[in-house]
């Protein structure tokens, strides 16, 4: 098996690992990916030939294609996602823990011969700008052409990364297989997967990932959630930085002053919409650095600096439209992959929310003619994968190796009651408690029940690679470093409803009105806020509401402290935090008692 491919690899450790894996998984061929456009076209051609990829109308979506996954492989599978640490308590109560030795043995059995009849693709990738002190290099071995094309969009990958790795550089080993070997002469299915044996496994002892059975997004594109969050969060704790499920935006006011904010929301709560927000208020500008992941490190001047480790967007399609997010539509106009959306007769894509009326003659995400009134035409978790460079509001500093200085951190979720539109933490410790207390109505990004309220601290519940209580502690530790100039922390909630069940706040581009208030607060404007037990709330007159038709009752609902609701909220958070036992930092317990005491 060590023939043509081995001469392309100068790194002996990498060469040896590829050889070991090849002996285990027995592929028909091995291919080192160079990341070129011609390679992308060739691999896409393989998918088109196999029937998994459908080219879109080049007049509407040049160099774009639609992929339909198996209905059994459509979202992240948290129940099959594992953190392996020597001691169970290091993984904590919010992760699925397995003994690393036992799990490695189990995976050896699953991976044995799993690439028979397939090509093993070697994907060298870099999370973060090449040659940045922030960056991590990984190598993903996969048998999925879909993963090759998606990783080309989502990461910096190929020959450049291999060169940067040199002959001795360290890298994260990421092994992936769809888990569907082919016998000689056996015809392949369009989307091979192995739903009964799915495993997405993270080994913190050697910072590696093994993923089996799923070809979908976060389960298979191992640079994304696996390396950039689950492994990176563990590394960040030991090295004094943060790996977070956050967007990063640059905001410029009419006077030309610019600030960078990071914001954390659970999946499908409007991260991409906020990251690409198009302001309605004259003179304001919002530019995007990233919509999903932020790596944040203390800089030489004591401020916290953030980079987006990704190279593309993996956005939820349903609900994205010219009204809600015109910049996202412009971003995925060309060179993009659409997964599990509907197809129009003229070779265009469609999903719920794209237009008010569906076009006639749609083919749904399963490949069947679609009838209005039945199941959705596009899967609720259907996606677009698009290069970050195509974003029309991309910030000039998007590729800065040093990152950008963060002046505000924002936490949000999907809450219909109690949580106000915006509030500012009274201290860093209080801000960490706001992050730890986050909960949200669940969405289609995870397999399971939709619409239930689930606790999702820091929107990191599925992504924190170690004990969440130790993670809270790590966040709190930043306050004890007196040389740091820490950003202010805010909570926001775009999803409050009135008694009739209607959203009170218009959301989308109007969220800039809240960002404007936060901007002014970071400039030290005292008179625009009032102090309450839950934090600083806007004075009603301080929010720019020009052009909005909000009643005084609506404004009161959005900006007041619902005492009984908050007492229930504190009790709920305290009850949830019992899962952490004695590991829960005392600071969080104290903050919850303070809020309760002051409310009473």
Swiss-Prot record:
According to its UniProt record, which protein family does this protein belong to? Belongs to the phosphoenolpyruvate carboxykinase [GTP] family.
Which Pfam families does the UniProt record give? PEPCK_GTP, PEPCK_N
Superkingdom in the source lineage:
Bacteria
Q: Where is the active site?
A: 269
Q: Which Gene3D superfamilies match?
A: 3.90.228.20, Phosphoenolpyruvate Carboxykinase, domain 1, Phosphoenolpyruvate Carboxykinase, domain 2
Single annotated GO MF:
phosphoenolpyruvate carboxykinase (GTP) activity
UniProt organism field: Chlamydia caviae (strain ATCC VR-813 / DSM 19441 / 03DC25 / GPIC)
List the protein's name: Phosphoenolpyruvate carboxykinase [GTP]
Q: What is the lineage of its organism?
A: Bacteria, Pseudomonadati, Chlamydiota, Chlamydiia, Chlamydiales
Q: What InterPro entries does the entry give?
A: PEP_carboxykin_GTP_CS (IPR018091), PEP_carboxykinase_C (IPR013035), PEP_carboxykinase_GTP (IPR008209), PEP_carboxykinase_GTP_C (IPR035077), PEP_carboxykinase_GTP_N (IPR035078), PEP_carboxykinase_N (IPR008210)
Q: Which residues bind Mn(2+)?
A: 225, 245, 292
What are its cofactors? Mn(2+)
What is the primary gene name for this protein? pckG
Please explain the role this protein plays, according to its UniProt record: Catalyzes the conversion of oxaloacetate (OAA) to phosphoenolpyruvate (PEP), the rate-limiting step in the metabolic pathway that produces glucose from lactate and other precursors derived from the citric acid cycle.
The pathway that the record names for this protein is: Carbohydrate biosynthesis; gluconeogenesis
Give the cofactor binding note: Binds 1 Mn(2+) ion per subunit.
Set out the biological process GO terms recorded for this chain's protein.
Answer: cellular response to glucose stimulus; gluconeogenesis; glycerol biosynthetic process from pyruvate; oxaloacetate metabolic process; propionate catabolic process; response to lipid; response to starvation
The answer, when asked if Cytoplasm is one of the entry's keywords, is: yes
């Amino acid at each position: 098996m060590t023939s043509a491919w081995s001469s392309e690899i100068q790194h002996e450790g990498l060469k040896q690992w590829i050889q070991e894996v090849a002996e285990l998984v027995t592929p028909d061929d091995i291919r080192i990916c160079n990341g070129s456009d011609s390679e992308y076209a060739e691999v896409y051609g393989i998918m088109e030939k196999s029937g998994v990829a459908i080219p879109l109308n080049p007049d509407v979506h040049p160099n774009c294609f639609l992929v339909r996954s198996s209905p059994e492989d459509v979202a992240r599978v948290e129940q099959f996602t594992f953190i392996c640490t020597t001691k169970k308590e290091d993984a904590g109560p919010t992760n699925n823990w397995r003994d690393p030795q036992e799990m490695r043995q189990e995976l050896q059995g699953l991976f044995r011969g799993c690439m028979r009849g397939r090509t093993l693709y070697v994907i060298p990738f870099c999370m973060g700008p090449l040659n940045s002190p922030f960056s991590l290099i990984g190598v993903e071995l996969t048998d999925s052409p879909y993963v090759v094309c998606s990783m080309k969009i989502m990461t910096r990958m190929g020959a450049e990364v291999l060169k940067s790795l040199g002959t001795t550089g360290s890298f994260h080993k990421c092994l992936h297989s769809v888990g569907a070997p082919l016998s000689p002469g056996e015809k392949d299915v369009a989307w091979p997967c192995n739903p009964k044996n799915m495993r997405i496994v993270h080994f913190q002892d050697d910072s590696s990932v093994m993923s089996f059975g799923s070809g979908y997004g976060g389960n298979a594109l191992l640079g994304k959630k696996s390396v950039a969050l689950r492994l990176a969060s563990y590394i960040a704790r030991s090295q004094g930085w943060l790996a977070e499920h956050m967007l990063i935006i640059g905001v410029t006011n009419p006077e030309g002053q610019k600030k960078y904010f990071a914001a954390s929301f659970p999946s499908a709560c409007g991260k991409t919409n906020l990251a690409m927000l198009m302001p309605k208020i004259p003179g304001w500008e919002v530019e995007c650095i990233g919509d999903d992941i932020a790596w944040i490190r203390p800089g030489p001047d004591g401020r916290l600096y953030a980079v987006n480790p990704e190279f593309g967007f993996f956005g939820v399609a349903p609900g994205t439209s010219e009204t809600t997010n015109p910049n996202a539509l412009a971003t995925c106009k060309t060179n993009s992959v659409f997964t599990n959306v509907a197809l129009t007769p003229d070779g265009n894509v469609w999903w719920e929310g794209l237009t008010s009326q569906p076009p006639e003659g749609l083919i749904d995400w399963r490949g069947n003619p679609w009838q209005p009134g039945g199941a959705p035409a596009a899967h609720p978790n259907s996606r677009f994968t698009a290069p970050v460079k195509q974003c029309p509001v991309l910030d000039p500093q998007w590729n800065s190796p040093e990152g950008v200085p963060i002046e505000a951190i924002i936490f949000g979720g999907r809450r219909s009651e109690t949580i106000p539109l915006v509030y500012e933490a009274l201290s860093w410790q209080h801000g960490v408690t706001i992050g730890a207390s986050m909960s949200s109505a669940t969405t289609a990004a995870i397999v399971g029940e939709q619409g239930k309220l689930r606790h999702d601290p820091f929107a990191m519940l599925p992504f924190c690679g170690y004990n969440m209580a130790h993670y809270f502690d790590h966040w709190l530790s930043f306050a004890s470093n007196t040389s740091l100039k820490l950003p202010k922390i805010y909570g926001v909630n775009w999803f409050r409803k009135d008694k009739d069940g209607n959203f009170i706040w218009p959301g989308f581009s109007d969220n800039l009105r809240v960002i404007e208030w936060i901007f002014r607060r970071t400039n030290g404007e005292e008179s625009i806020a009032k102090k309450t037990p839950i934090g600083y709330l806007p004075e009603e007159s301080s929010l720019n509401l020009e052009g909005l038709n909000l009643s005084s009752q609506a404004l009161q609902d959005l900006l007041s402290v619902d005492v009984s609701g908050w007492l229930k909220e504190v009790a709920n958070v305290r009850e949830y935090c019992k899962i952490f036992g004695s590991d829960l930092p005392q600071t969080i317990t104290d903050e919850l008692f303070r809020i309760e005491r002051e409310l009473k």
